[in-house]
């Protein structure tokens, strides 16, 4: 299931796109097969990167017409290995709720996004997440799990301040 609407992100041919916290690559694959562009997926989990790679090799471009290029690697959202103003679009789907210093991750996202670039962010909705936390103390104590619940206005403020 994609949690970022690519139509709203408005990926154009030739764009350079970062999928931060790509996991198994669902958004990487969607962008790669959607537009002729360069998609870079990064995640902390090496096993996740291997699974994401399988998605590209399982469905290769058999026409030979695609100009899309992909790259995958292990990277930390707090220390992205990219120059300033590298990406036209950045996807960060269901990631920020896992990061203790998420404000620094936001700074990194803004740093690598070109002026005028677009950023697609998704986090779990407030009330369903709140209910999960209420029903199970273990839910938010899981290593690497959700450590924060966002309200939409709070997250918007974090990106615009």
Q: How does the language model describe each region?
A:
Residues 1-83, 89-93, 103-106, 145-149:
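Conserved N-terminal segment of class I S-adenosyl-L-methionine
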Residues 26, 55-59, 78, 100-108, ...:
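S-adenosyl-L-methionine-dependent methyltransferase catalytic module, highlighting the catalytic core
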Residues 94-98:
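A short His-aromatic
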